[in-house]
Regions:
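Alpha-carbonic anhydrase
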Residues: 1-234
Length: 234
């Protein structure tokens, strides 16, 4: 099956989400996976309690930014930060964002959703989603006193990915797919329940092309189970 990285796709018109599967065989194969993402997440009687812990082992490291697949990606230079789930390490490979949020929690769509893409030694993906409200006077993402910095001119950033995360990491967990072509699965999805605050100035350098809507519509649940892990404050 030819993986054609040159197939153009987007979020409206002939190349929009409804037509992704018809753009090439690779996308068509991915769309056959029945458990697609994103989905509507709710805490209800049918939500199962998550028994396995997702643990974060992030550290300050160097990233570069790249423009591809209809958004900006922050890509780490080295394999340093990772998460652990069921005794398996998944290293952080990519950070990108979607406007507005792709997942919806309890009926509410947020302004922006960051995706933290991880991969284990078997090339299996685990993605963590974090939602934000865009704010005017608050919600800074980096701490200069900590030696963290963003430099879009040099395409070099020093940051601990943990700054993107809420202190309290209660989250949903389900099996889904990539939300961009080829939308293949299975992928372990974890979506933080706590919504953060992000200063809208974060988006200023990306104004124009990358501050446009790039969210895939909600997909059917198709009978899958949703788990919830509640983290109690220490």
């Amino acid at each position: 099956l030819k993986k054609n990285m040159d197939v153009e796709w987007g979020y409206s018109g002939d190349k929009g989400p409804e037509n992704w599967a018809s753009l090439c065989d690779w996308f068509a194969r991915g769309a056959e996976f029945p458990l697609q993402s994103p989905i509507h997440l709710t805490k209800g009687e049918e939500t199962k309690i998550e028994g396995d812990t997702l643990s974060f082992h992030y550290q300050k490291q160097r990233f570069t930014d790249k423009e591809f697949k209809n958004t900006i990606h922050l890509v780490p230079f080295d394999q340093l930060s990772y998460v652990e789930f069921k005794k398996e390490r998944y290293y952080l490979t990519d950070i990108h964002f979607h406007l507005p949020s792709e997942h919806i929690i309890n009926g509410k769509q947020e302004d922006i959703e960051f995706h933290f893409v991880h991969m284990n030694s078997k090339k299996e993906n685990l993605v963590v989603g974090v939602m934000y409200q865009l704010m005017v006077q608050e919600g800074w993402l980096y701490n200069q006193e900590n030696g963290e910095s963003w430099n879009l001119e040099k395409h070099e950033h020093w940051v601990n990915p943990d700054v993107f995360f809420p202190e309290q990491k209660s989250h949903f967990h389900y099996i889904g797919s990539l939300t961009t072509p080829p939308t293949s699965g299975p992928i372990q999805w974890f979506v933080m329940d706590h919504v953060g605050k992000l200063n809208q100035e974060f988006l200023l350098p990306f104004d124009g092309q990358y501050a446009r809507p790039n969210n895939r519509p909600i997909q059917p649940l198709n009978g899958r189970e949703i788990y919830y892990f509640e983290e109690f404050e220490q």
